[in-house]
């Protein structure tokens, strides 16, 4: 687990099947913290998480946020260890293998200064982004992935009912001002990320 931006930590688990890193994120801000899409963790990573976001730390973990129904990953184990609730968009709750403690809706405010919004026509009906306006950071799950450093892609067309409509739905990202884009799968873009989104959408 390493700090990739001020107050934002990341770790990953490599997927042999997808040949990509599955990324998780810890956001720390003003006395609280949240985890997003946590993949598998080593005991060393759990220890680091405890020092940063444990109950007696300066930034106790407030929630485990899932961008979509397919990113449950290690959330049950983290919930057990840290007694933190799992949250997912209300449209994806029914598809979970486990159980969410709470749901959120399009436009809701979440801990650590995050706001969430939902994309239309994606792989799952509740595919969501988390936006931290103060830091200019956008966090995605499967909406876009980073197969190649500095570039963005969608999932394969067979993952959608209509890949053209799915791509059109991503134009919602252009309504927000962000410098960094953190993705659930592959390589994130830490600078000039909105421009990379524009390039992809125009391709």
Q: What residues fall within each predicted segment?
A:
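Active-site metal-binding motif and surrounding structural segment of the metallo-beta-lactamase
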Residues: 43-91, 180
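Amphipathic coiled-coil/heptad-repeat helices and related helical stalk/stem segments
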Residues: 20, 45, 71, 165-166
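Intrinsically disordered, low-complexity segments enriched in small residues
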Residues: 28-31, 35, 48
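Short, compositionally biased "basic patch" segments
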Residues: 1-28
